[in-house]
UniProtKB/Swiss-Prot annotation:
Complex I is composed of 45 different subunits. Keywords: Disulfide bond, Electron transport, Lipoprotein, Membrane, Mitochondrion, Mitochondrion inner membrane, Myristate, Phosphoprotein, Primary mitochondrial disease, Respiratory chain, Transport. InterPro entries: NDUB7 (IPR008698). Disulfide bonds join C59-C90, C69-C80. The lineage of its organism: Eukaryota, Metazoa, Chordata, Craniata, Vertebrata. It is found in: Mitochondrion inner membrane; Mitochondrion intermembrane space. This is NADH dehydrogenase [ubiquinone] 1 beta subcomplex subunit 7. A motif (Cx9C motif 2) lies at residues 80-90. Coiled coil: none annotated. Contains two C-X9-C motifs that are predicted to form a helix-coil-helix structure, permitting the formation of intramolecular disulfide bonds. Residues 56-98 form the CHCH domain. It is linked to Mitochondrial complex I deficiency, nuclear type 39: A form of mitochondrial complex I deficiency, the most common biochemical signature of mitochondrial disorders, a group of highly heterogeneous conditions characterized by defective oxidative phosphorylation, which collectively affects 1 in 5-10000 live births. Clinical disorders have variable severity, ranging from lethal neonatal disease to adult-onset neurodegenerative disorders. Belongs to the complex I NDUFB7 subunit family. A lipid is attached at G2 (N-myristoyl glycine).
Length: 137
């Protein structure tokens, strides 16, 4: 995800979303049937598993299962391959989804800027097909 840094510093920063901030557009904008993502693991389960704050994400339920498996089969560290795979795959899907959300936010910001520019041109009287009076003379 380094391309956003280059576009942010060298390109137009007004249409590039800040990756550290929450999205400015509602998640169901353009998707009326879209459901909100829900955490599978509850706050109490994450506290009981003593997960650090950095690990409390949408894949925490897989991590809790992995840590439990590691604890239950301690000497045999290879016994938890499936749990590890499930957690890694969930983290990958979460990363891809966040990148898609970032790209969606960037495109919506570009669209908003284009619409504002078009509205400003129409308000000035220089819409498509119209000629500025100074140019017509």
């Amino acid at each position: 995800m380094g391309a956003h840094l280059v576009r942010r510093y060298l390109g137009d920063a007004s249409v590039e979303p800040d990756p550290l901030q929450m999205p400015t557009f509602p998640p169901d904008y353009g998707f009326p049937e879209r459901k909100e993502r829900e955490m599978v693991a509850t706050q109490q389960e994450m506290m009981d598993a003593q997960l650090r704050l950095q690990l409390r994400d949408y894949c925490a339920h897989h991590l809790i299962r992995l840590l439990k498996c590691k604890r239950d089969s301690f000497p045999n560290f290879l016994a938890c391959k499936q749990e590890r795979h499930d957690w890694d795959y969930c983290e990958h899907r979460d990363y891809v989804m966040r990148m898609k959300e970032f790209e969606r936010e960037r495109r919506l910001l570009q669209r908003k800027k284009r619409r504002e520019k078009k509205a400003a041109e129409l308000a000035k009287g220089q819409g498509p097909g119209e000629v500025d009076p100074k140019v017509a003379l």
